[in-house]
Design a protein with these regions (language model features):
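Extended substrate-binding grooves/exosites of carbohydrate-active enzymes
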Residues: 1-176, 186-189, 194-195, 199-202
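Intrinsically disordered, low-complexity regions of eukaryotic proteins
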Residues: 90, 167, 208, 252-253
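Extended, solvent-exposed regions of the mature portions of secreted/cell-surface glycoproteins
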Residues: 170-174, 178, 207, 214
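Short strand-edge motifs at loop-to-beta-strand transitions and within beta-strands
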Residues: 181-185
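Edge beta-strands of extracellular beta-sandwich domains
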Residues: 203-223
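Compositionally biased, intrinsically disordered or flexible polar/acidic segments
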Residues: 220-258
Length: 258
């Protein structure tokens, strides 16, 4: 028996997914199950620190898939699942954040992987070490800064290695244990460009240890908490009204928040 299931996207909450499967298994214990479709849309321009269903933020798609995939992997009476879809594709009648595009893909329409693609890679590629700073989709950030205090923002890493150490501009932010193939650090942003790097130890088959690394630059626009004539002179300000998402313009790379 197969179902197209979207609990936590078109309605309900994420835990409705496993509840539905359990209910169906109770009714039909001898029937193998397949989830023939599941997925959530994401728009590279939209990011949220409080992601919720149908906001099309990159973060909600990650949250959704980080919930669904373990259920599919760990539920013994589920034979398999098909993520909808692998690639963002044209869909003439859609009128969402990206008109005429179904953006549930793990990769963009030009085949560039979204960050969440590397979550699947970390889960399934147990033959190779995977370490990916999941911020390629959010390299232009902004935040409200009080005085000169750093602005803490999350940076996620996808990995199949047991522990990750994260660095900002060469300074260690410590190590964290991996849970569900993810590690999330609160990173203090304070200037226009930061160099973020991640390192993890990988035990080779011969019991030797190699160091796996990933790195990228993140641009940051601090927005003064108290705007005045002086600090507005060199600041291009955009205001996003009515949304809990950050929005980054394709043309200007200007990032705005509520």
């Amino acid at each position: 028996v197969g179902w197209n299931l979207y609990q936590g996207w078109y309605g309900g909450d994420l835990t409705g997914f496993e509840r539905f499967l359990a209910e169906q298994h109770k009714k039909y214990p001898s029937h193998p199950m397949v989830v023939s479709e599941y997925g959530a849309g994401s728009d590279k321009r939209l990011h949220s620190l409080q992601p919720h269903a149908f906001d099309f933020s990159i973060e909600y798609q990650q949250k959704y898939l980080e919930h669904y995939l373990p259920v599919l992997e760990e539920t013994p009476y589920v034979c398999g699942g098909t993520h909808w879809n692998f690639i963002d594709f044209s869909s003439a009648l859609r009128d969402e954040s990206m008109p005429r595009i179904n953006n549930k893909g793990l990769v963009y329409s030009d085949r560039t992987p979204k960050d969440v693609y590397y979550y699947y890679k970390a889960v399934w590629r147990q033959d190779i070490p995977v370490l990916h700073i999941a911020s390629r989709d959010w390299t232009h950030r902004s935040g409200v800064q009080h005085g000169k205090a750093p602005v803490p923002l999350p940076v996620k890493v996808y990995t199949n290695l047991p522990e990750v150490e994260l660095f900002i501009d060469g300074t260690s932010l410590g190590k964290q244990k991996t849970e569900n193939y993810t590690v999330t650090f609160q990173v203090p942003f304070s200037r226009k460009e930061h160099f973020i790097s991640a390192k993890a130890e990988n035990k080779e088959a011969d019991k030797s240890i190699s160091m796996i690394e990933d790195a990228l630059h993140i641009n940051f626009t601090p927005i003064p908490a108290n705007l005045n004539e002086t600090n507005l002179r060199n600041l291009e300000l955009a205001v996003n009204v009515g949304s809990n998402c950050f929005y980054t313009s394709d043309e200007s790379r200007l990032s705005s928040e509520v």
